[in-house]
Amino acid sequence: MPSSSNSAAFSLDEFAKALDKHDYHAEKGQTVHGKICQHANEGVYVDFGGKSPGFVPVQELGLRPHAEIEDSFPLDSAWDFLVTSEQNDEGQVRLSRRQLQIQQSWENLAELEESGKTLEMVVTGTNKGGVVGDVEGLRGFIPRSHLMHKDNMDALVGQVLKAHILEANQDNNKLVLTQRRIQQAESMGKIAAGNIYEGKVAKIQPYGVFVEIEGVTGLLHVSQVSGTRVDSLNTLFAFGQAISVYVQEIDEYKNRISLSTRILETYPGELVEKFDEMMADAPNRLPLVQSKQNLGDKQEQLEKS
């Protein structure tokens, strides 16, 4: 019959093996949930059910510094952490809340990029190319050419800017934003179909003239220039030239504005023959446009009847 000491030793061995068998092993890259169990000068210890408490260095407690660790992470408070190391000989792993937050921020940005929704960036500084700032704890950049207000970038420091994502690359830690879509949306709200506006010629193509109105660009198609044939648009229009146009249609979904000067003519070819005179009187011709449209509606009704 075995002695009691051997029996006790056997039981202790079996107990140790059972502990090893059922020990919780946290893998690197895994997310764990645990409670703060100890504070230290260099960080905090977290009980997440492992063989030993995990350690979180003070710089890994969050995306932004914490003045008083004890206040921000009181004992027994529960948090999620990312395992950033393999277990050492004592079974301890290193944890990070900061890197978990970074992962979550990139995931949020991917959703915002896909949905096309706006986000906010707190401007923290400027450089020759534009402004930099904080976006969910990540470093964002808006090129100067994509800013709504670019004349005094230093005045933007400390401000919260709304923007859309131009490029989000987690592998390269690159986040580039733009305010152009917001600017376009605001500008689109300043104009309405059925009105006459003054704009400037922004570009001339064989198929039409691009005209900038209130910060957005519309197309004056060659077929809508005049009631008579126009062989060369360059004979009538020049870059930067101020002209009056009628807004026929605004397609916000396609971000497209259709313009016309043809509808402003009192007779076909007036724009070609008397360009300056017609442009000078164009702002007064909305009643003419409306009468033409009413006549067109009546003709359409007669054709259908």
From Swiss-Prot:
Residues spanning the signal sequence: none
GO (cellular component) term, any one: ribonucleoprotein complex
PROSITE patterns documented for this protein: S1
Xref: Gene3D superfamilies: Nucleic acid-binding proteins
Record protein name field: Small ribosomal subunit protein bS1B
Source organism of the structure: Synechocystis sp. (strain ATCC 27184 / PCC 6803 / Kazusa)
Task performed by this protein: Binds mRNA.
GO molecular function: mRNA binding; structural constituent of ribosome
Family label: Belongs to the bacterial ribosomal protein bS1 family.
CDD domains named in the record: S1_RPS1_repeat_ec2_hs2
S1 motif domain: residues covered: 29-98, 116-180, 194-262
Superkingdom of the organism of origin: Bacteria
